[in-house]
Amino acid sequence: MFSTTGPYSVVARSMLNGAMLAFRENAEAAGPVVLEPIVVNPSGDLARYRALSLELLGAGIRQVVGCYTSSSRKEVIPCFEKFDGLLWYPSHYEGFESSDNVIYTGASPNQHVLPLVDYLASRVGYRAFCVGSNYIWAWENNRIFREALTARGGSVIAERYLSVGDTEFDQVISAILDQRPDFVFNNLIGTSAYAFFRAFRAACKVRGIDQANDIPVASCTLSEPELAEIGGGAIDGHLSSSVYFSSLNSPPNAAFIETYAKAFPDGPVSSADAEASYIAVKLLAASLEQAGTDDARPVRAAVANQRLLAPQGEVRIDPQTYHAWLTPRIGRSAANGQFEVLLEARSPVAPDPYLVQSSPRFAVTMRSPVLRVVQS
């Protein structure tokens, strides 16, 4: 269930590609469990997400891989809880959520927000200007970011929110340039994000500012398919915190990239969310085989026993939170549309969706993943 049309369709199409690649590999393996995908497109419409979820669940389909935005996920969770189905949610998100009817294969906030704060505070600066799409992802991500940055002695000097799909940034960019933060923390999504990157780079150029070095833009969402959408000489020098980049140098990723490119020559290229969708289907197939049924509770119990060598490295589902152990990384975008990996964790990091082990709000010393420098 991916919105392959609408304001964030580029990312959603890469997610669908990742899922379909895993379905294809499942069919080719000819194992005891054969998955037959049914693809639906909510087009970014929340009401449509709910209607399609009810339609699928009402037809007896208990396992659904999908949703990108947090608003869509929250819209459909009550449907899955009512019908006792499982939603496999394959995207990074803001955390602070738990449901017996959701398996989270994307990054939790301690796996993407906190590593980014550590990197920025230690290497870029302490004054942030936050801009985001006006919905829960940006609200919560900015809240976590502000809390973590403040704990490091930094500050958020301003926050601005725009409607999803909004592409008018003159006032926001003027405010950024007037206040000259050390960096911009970007939580815009889809077409809004692409327009912002282009407009901000152009405005800085007019003022003689080297945007990538003087006021870098950092985010937890920017991915390879989106760099292609930004275009216009504005794709290089941006920082992204992610558990996967397609430039990872490893045999599992090389095989994944080759197979993905052959399967989807027209794109979009692979991304962290595409990989998370691939992981979700792989874990679903293994869990169905172990459970011997598609009932939600046995499948949920079975997924905690699975281990997967994914393109990013080892992945497993935490049996307490049903979020994934993943490997945090920091990347910097290059003009070739790829990311140079600057830092990465040495091993998968346990999910901490409520930041119980990571947040100063709980009177615990902040502990974000320790990342090592990656040699070029």
What kind of region is each of these model predictions?
Residues 1-17, 40-44, 269-273:
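Extracytoplasmic "Venus flytrap"
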Residues 1-14, 23, 68, 127-131:
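Short beta-strand segments enriched in small/hydrophobic residues
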Residues 14-15, 29-95:
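Beta-alpha junction/loop-to-helix N-cap segments that form part of ligand/metal-binding clefts
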Residues 28-44, 99-101, 150-166:
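Short beta-strand elements in bilobed, periplasmic/extracellular small-molecule ligand-binding domains
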Residues 56-70, 89-90, 129-130, 180-196, ...:
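Periplasmic-binding protein-like
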Residues 105-161:
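An alpha-beta-alpha
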Residues 200-276:
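Extracellular/periplasmic periplasmic-binding protein-like sensory domains
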Residues 311-376:
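Solvent-exposed, acidic/polar segments of extracytosolic/periplasmic ligand-binding ectodomains
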